């Protein structure tokens, strides 16, 4: 197995759905199925914060979500927890700046997908040099889902990454909705990552379809 290509990674980032049980008011398994039917291209399991499952319950829930992703041939990524990602043989892991260092993560994960949250050009360059396959850049807009977020960067912050020569695939993170998706792609992102825009939507299926439409309308400006 070899590392994922930039072109394939870019395609997978189009509509990146992140969810845990506490991000939903309806059955999370059904929400994931509806989102997959609607066209999400990659899924991240993020079970943390108030009311999150722990221990065996968390692992069982992750396995259920992973099985659904497999049915649809969509990569299943684990947020922060490298050990869980290895235990589940997940397709990859996403880490933040406060989590396990990228060099150690790459050693453990082999050629699997690794995404890194970055807020500065220095963090981005370090992540790329040490094996990141994609960057999560944000928060682009204000968000209520994550309580420990950094300062809002806006689409200008995202565009700055491209202006400074950051050429690997980027997914925009934070406060992204159907209405502002186009501006995130225009600023240089390959795709958008969302939680509540799908998990709390009246119809996860319809919401996902609209996000897919917005991303494909703009098309990424990067040729890998």
UniProtKB/Swiss-Prot annotation:
One of its GO terms (biological process) is thiamine diphosphate biosynthetic process. Its EC number is 2.5.1.3. 4-amino-2-methyl-5-(diphosphooxymethyl)pyrimidine binds at residues 44-48, 79, 117, 146. It catalyses: 2-[(2R,5Z)-2-carboxy-4-methylthiazol-5(2H)-ylidene]ethyl phosphate + 4-amino-2-methyl-5-(diphosphooxymethyl)pyrimidine + 2 H(+) = thiamine phosphate + CO2 + diphosphate; 2-(2-carboxy-4-methylthiazol-5-yl)ethyl phosphate + 4-amino-2-methyl-5-(diphosphooxymethyl)pyrimidine + 2 H(+) = thiamine phosphate + CO2 + diphosphate; 4-methyl-5-(2-phosphooxyethyl)-thiazole + 4-amino-2-methyl-5-(diphosphooxymethyl)pyrimidine + H(+) = thiamine phosphate + diphosphate. 2-[(2R,5Z)-2-carboxy-4-methylthiazol-5(2H)-ylidene]ethyl phosphate binds at residues 143-145, 175, 195-196. Keywords: Magnesium, Metal-binding, Thiamine biosynthesis, Transferase. Mg(2+) binds at residues 80, 99. HAMAP family: TMP_synthase (MF_00097). This is Thiamine-phosphate synthase. It comes from Bacillus cereus (strain ATCC 10987 / NRS 248).
């Amino acid at each position: 197995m070899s590392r994922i290509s930039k072109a394939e990674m870019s395609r997978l980032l189009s509509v990146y759905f992140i969810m845990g049980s506490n991000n939903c008011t309806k059955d999370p398994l059904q929400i994931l199925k509806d989102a997959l039917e609607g066209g999400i291209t990659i899924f991240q399991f993020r079970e943390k914060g108030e009311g999150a499952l722990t221990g065996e319950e968390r692992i069982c829930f992750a396995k259920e979500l992973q099985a659904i992703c497999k049915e649809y041939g969509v990569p299943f990524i684990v947020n922060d927890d490298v050990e869980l990602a290895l235990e589940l043989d997940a397709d990859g892991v996403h880490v933040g700046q406060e989590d396990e260092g990228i060099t150690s993560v790459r050693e453990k994960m082999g050629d699997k997908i690794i995404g890194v949250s970055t807020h500065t050009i220095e963090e981005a360059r370090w992540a790329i040099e040490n094996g990141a396959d994609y960057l999560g850049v944000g928060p682009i807009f204000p968000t209520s889902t994550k309580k420990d977020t950094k300062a809002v960067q806006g689409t200008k912050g995202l565009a700055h990454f491209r202006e400074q020569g950051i050429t690997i695939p980027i997914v925009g993170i934070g406060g992204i909705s159907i209405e502002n998706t186009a501006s995130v792609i225009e600023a240089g992102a390959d795709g958008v990552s969302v939680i509540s825009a799908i998990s709390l939507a009246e119809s996860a299926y319809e919401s996902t379809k609209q996000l897919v439409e917005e991303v494909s309308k703009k098309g990424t400006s990067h040729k890998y």
